[in-house]
Amino acid sequence: MKVLVLNCGSSSVKYQVFDMKNESVLAKGLAERIGLEGSRIVYQRGSEAKKVFEIPLPTHKKAIEEIFKLLVDKNNGVLQSLNEIDAVGHRVVHGGDKFVESVLVNDEVYSIFKGILDLAPLHNPYNLQGVDACSELMPGVPQVLVFDTSFHQTMPEEAYIYALPYEWYEKYKIRRYGFHGTSHYYVSRRVAELIGRPVEELKIISCHLGNGASITAIKNGKSIDTSMGYTPLEGLVMGTRCGDIDPAIPILLMEKENLTPKQMDEILNKKSGILGISGVSSDFRDVGEAAEKGNKRAELALKVFAYRVKKYIGAYYAILGGLDVLVFTAGVGERGPLERSLICSGLEHLGIKLDPEKNKVKGEELRISAPDSKVEVWVIPTNEELMIARETVRVVGEKIIKKVI
């Protein structure tokens, strides 16, 4: 079975084609700057070198159409025809409380999803455009929606209800949803496999630390709490997002600086976080280099970031009633020895102790905890695309039309 995985953003489409017999990647790449000057497609066949094709891409449909042409191209392709694609899996950012698991697209599912586009206005509409494009270009091929939020639908009410007037939850569904669910799901299963224990027996804290960052408490294989909220703005300090702050601060600053809601949203999402504190960059590598050269604000940014993660680890240790495994994943989690060290320093009383040599690892699966650490600490590179492909195979096989609360 061959599966195409698509991740449609506002001006990009990431794609991978899997042969699910051995879960190998036949081709992958990125269409970028859609609707802008200088649009192009990055294409990589198997383990070969990447190729770049400068192509006008006015719409997402055109981008997907050009990707399809490359996949069946005589010189560069990996397919004889598009008929070899058995199913398409779409990464979808927000399923709200309507979708508790991945679903096969039909008219009813399409209509329900179209009704919740406003939950993630910067993401969901483009996910839908990907579905529309595939429906036109490959009619009849099964399509599956895999939601970032689905894994967190097992959270108890006390974890997802905000202390706001309850009618706002009833009327607008304002509640914690959480994100990065596909990543947290993947690494929790993968680490259980590596240590040889059923995930249903484990208490896991999963730290997805990239430019966007979240942390999840996983008990018996299920998410019981997560740091992101109604939007991905809540929780940890991120590359450009502020994470948890006093809710009165935006109101105060809007009055003092005469800012509109849109301007305030822009500041909180794109000008805060590591970038806002350091004044250097949103890239942790750049901030780390600046800190090594003595930049005090860069040092402070990294300390604030690590401190926030550490607080969440302590809180989730409490609600889990202990901890078996701490997992680091995503860009910073996989490739940030400094950040991992800052986070774990001082957590020895919780049974968390790193091996300094093993902690130097970057981008590889490895247990990095010391031999006498009661809690196993692992680096697990995430693989959301593979997880989406697996979910697509499962859903198409089981013909899961919908799971609506």
Swiss-Prot record:
The active site is at D148 (proton donor/acceptor). Transmembrane segments: none annotated. Keywords: ATP-binding, Cytoplasm, Kinase, Magnesium, Metal-binding, Nucleotide-binding, Transferase. Its EC number is 2.7.2.1. It comes from the Bacteria. It catalyses: acetate + ATP = acetyl phosphate + ADP. One of its GO terms (molecular function) is acetate kinase activity. The keyword ATP-binding applies. PROSITE patterns: ACETATE_KINASE_1 (PS01075), ACETATE_KINASE_2 (PS01076). ATP binds at K14, H208, L209, G210, N211, G212, D283, F284, R285. Mg(2+) binds at N7, E384. Mg(2+). Can also accept Mn(2+). Homodimer. Belongs to the acetokinase family. This is Acetate kinase. It comes from Dictyoglomus turgidum (strain DSM 6724 / Z-1310). The gene is ackA.
